[in-house]
């Protein structure tokens, strides 16, 4: 933006960072067990962040959660940004079924964004741990 190549962050993403664009860098990912081990070795808690954003089928989401738990994952972000109540209930049920903890996040990335305010999100459902 400072160089004048784009006027906004949204324009930068549309112009340079989408699939097949110049900033689309293909890379290889570490395995799920390796990623979880790194997180835990660093003293962190392995959490699946905003799983409703991945647009998985229910079956694929369930498989991801089961694989995550089997690899040592500990929690699912049950509440994120402005998601709807049915999504929260689905994610809470997945937590319970897989004996995982629940987390919450506002999905805040930067000042001025329109989809989420810092610290402004619903509480985790009472039946989650």
Each model region followed by its residue ranges:
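Charged catalytic cores and adjacent phosphate/nucleic-acid-binding surfaces used
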Residues: 3-7, 34-48, 52-129
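Active-site-proximal loop/helix segment associated with metal-binding centers of metalloenzymes
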Residues: 1-28, 35
């Amino acid at each position: 933006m400072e160089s004048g190549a784009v006027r906004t962050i949204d324009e930068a993403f549309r112009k340079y960072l989408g699939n097949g664009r110049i900033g689309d860098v293909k890379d290889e990912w570490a395995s799920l067990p390796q990623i979880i081990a790194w997180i835990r070795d660093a003293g962190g808690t392995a959490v699946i962040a905003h799983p409703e954003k991945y647009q998985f089928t229910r079956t694929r989401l369930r498989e991801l959660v089961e694989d995550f738990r089997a690899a040592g994952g500990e929690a699912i972000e049950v509440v994120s940004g402005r998601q709807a109540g049915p999504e929260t209930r689905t994610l809470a049920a997945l937590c319970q079924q897989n004996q995982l903890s629940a987390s919450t996040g506002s999905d805040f990335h930067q000042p001025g964004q329109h989809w989420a305010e810092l610290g402004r999100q619903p509480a985790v459902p009472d039946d989650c741990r």
